[in-house]
From Swiss-Prot:
Lineage of origin: Eukaryota, Metazoa, Chordata, Craniata, Vertebrata
EC number(s) from the headed UniProt entry: 3.5.1.121
Annotated site location: Essential for catalytic activity: C75
Its biological purpose: N-terminal asparagine deamidase that mediates deamidation of N-terminal asparagine residues to aspartate. Required for the ubiquitin-dependent turnover of intracellular proteins that initiate with Met-Asn. These proteins are acetylated on the retained initiator methionine and can subsequently be modified by the removal of N-acetyl methionine by acylaminoacid hydrolase (AAH). Conversion of the resulting N-terminal asparagine to aspartate by NTAN1/PNAD renders the protein susceptible to arginylation, polyubiquitination and degradation as specified by the N-end rule.
Signal peptide (residue range): none
Organism in which the protein naturally occurs: Homo sapiens (Human)
Protein name: Protein N-terminal asparagine amidohydrolase
GO CC terms, sorted: cytoplasm; nucleus
Activity control mechanisms: Inhibited by micromolar concentrations of copper and zinc ions.
GO biological process, one term: ubiquitin-dependent protein catabolic process
Catalytically driven reaction(s): N-terminal L-asparaginyl-[protein] + H2O + H(+) = N-terminal L-aspartyl-[protein] + NH4(+)
InterPro entries cross-referenced by the UniProt entry: NTAN1
Phenotypic consequence of C75 to A/S/T: Abolishes catalytic activity
UniProt main location, coarse: cytoplasm
Length: 310
């Protein structure tokens, strides 16, 4: 069954702006979200999701109470939630393979959902802006279309994307919202930024920059974050890129050079350095081809734990 708003099937294709104008509650929700002040989210109880990662958990989780992601310019952050059991998935989509990613998101929630119980699937889409290359617009269209193709009824509750998440300054366009968090217990979604993007922030970012596909990073049953084992081919021309100035890196390695947050270039440089240092991660980072496992400690912070059999 299709994507629904207020119980009615969404007419596609249409722009995000036209869609919310046809459904005033959607427009009002986007307006309220844009109007929020940004909350700084601390590391306690947080599971931070990087680009091309997804994480899913439920209110039964004793370790994780918040899922979040930020630094989305043309990317979209997607939250899918089952209202019956509270199972919640957050993912940071960049349009690499939306057709494959939406079924992954759906299956992650279905692995929790007892379909005999009451409740419905609700989706929230946030991110993107009116960028020159129309990458945000394309991703919005892809996500709406793919959710509409799924077998289950999916209720579109929040749509704050592309032109609905756009602000203009000196004739340049920027996103209003770069990041969001969702409270697993209360289902509240709010504007957020994060100081702590770990664990293993560089390793996870390197996998994405090296072209890795969307992956699930968290096992809610064991309450463990699982990283790897990853493999990638050596990053092409890594020395060339490391010798370029900030302007060249911004213009060539960003989908939206004018709209990136201030730390973007520093983040790309450190990720390139990591890729140069670890051209074959299977040998240097994943001893015995074992995943790196992390679990929250009593203070709500990530702590590395031993892999089984190590």
């Amino acid at each position: 069954m299709p994507l629904l708003v207020e119980g009615r099937r969404v007419r596609l294709p249409q722009s995000a702006g036209d869609l919310v104008r046809a459904h005033p509650p959607l427009e009002e929700r986007a307006r309220l979200l844009r109007g929020q002040s940004v909350q700084q989210v601390g590391p306690q109880g947080l599971l931070y999701v990087q680009q091309r990662e997804l994480a899913v958990t439920s209110p039964k989780d004793g370790s994780i109470s918040i899922l979040g992601s930020d630094d989305a310019t043309t990317c979209h952050i997607v939250v899918l939630r089952h209202t019956g059991n509270g199972a919640t998935c957050l993912t940071h989509c960049d349009g690499t393979d939306t057709k494959a990613e939406v079924p992954l998101i759906m299956n992650s929630i279905k692995s929790f959902s007892d379909h005999a119980q009451c409740g419905r699937l609700e989706v929230h889409l946030v991110g993107g802006f009116s960028d020159d290359r129309q990458l945000s617009q394309k991703l919005t269209h892809q996500l709406l279309s793919e959710f509409d193709r799924q077998e289950d009824d999916i209720h579109l509750v929040t749509l704050c994307v592309t032109e609905l998440n756009d602000r203009e300054e000196n004739e340049n366009h920027f996103p209003v919202i770069y990041g969001i968090a969702v409270n697993i217990k209360t289902a509240e979604i709010y504007r957020a930024s994060f100081q702590d993007r770990g664990p293993e922030e560089q390793l996870r970012a390197a996998r994405t920059l090296a072209g890795g596909p969307m992956i699930s990073i968290y096992d809610a049953e064991t309450e463990q974050l699982r990283i790897g084992p990853y493999s990638w081919t050596p990053f092409p021309h890594v020395d060339f890129w490391l010798h370029q100035d900030d302007k060249q890196i911004l213009e060539n390695l960003s989908t939206s050079p004018l709209a990136e947050p201030p730390h973007f270039v520093e983040h790309i440089r450190s990720t390139l350095m990591f890729l140069k240092k670890h051209p074959s991660p299977a040998h240097t980072l994943f001893s015995g081809n074992k995943a790196l496992l992390y679990k929250k400690n009593e203070d709500g912070l990530w702590e590395k734990i031993s892999s089984p059999g190590s």
